[in-house]
Amino acid sequence: MNRRNLMLSLLALSLWPTIAIAQTASWKLGDTVRPPALTLLNGQPVNWEPLKGKVIVLEFWGSWCPFCARQNPILDRFYKQHQARGLEVITVSLDKTADAAQQYMKKGGYSFKAGMVTPEWDTIYKQRRGLPQLFVIDRKGKLVLIEVREMLEDDILDIARFL
């Protein structure tokens, strides 16, 4: 009996990454979502618990992406203007190296948080094709906006309606 329980436990543990990836891969507009673990470029993990009740903007970008280079300064200004109202911006770099992402963040002087893509995050990104890709999660954890394109300033300012 103990051996059977042990085997079932080991099987469940071995399937956990697959289950976690499957959950993130199914993000659809209107769903309540939970972002996967993310380690920021500074080595700190994102603690999602204190962010409950905030509006979260998640963005995928790459340092080579000209659309991201135009969108990110606008997104950063928007973040600075609305952070006190409960806005959090967390971005995920698709760069091959953390060094390239760190240089991009430093050069842009961005204040939003950034991490590197992982297999769990990659499943979310691969739902759509193109950069930048932006998701907005409302205060209740519901996915309320998905954009796969360069957002102009008016588009980004419109995110304030979720605050």
What do the predicted segments below correspond to?
Residues 80-118:
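Conserved segment of the thioredoxin-like fold in thiol-based oxidoreductases
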Residues 9-17:
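Bacterial N-terminal signal peptides
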Residues 60-77:
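Conserved redox-active cysteine motifs that mediate thiol-disulfide chemistry
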Residues 106-110, 118-159:
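Thiol/disulfide oxidoreductase modules built on the thioredoxin-like
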Residues 3-7:
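N-terminal export leaders
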Residues 16-35, 103:
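N-proximal helix/coil linker or "cap" segments that precede and/or mark the start of modular domains
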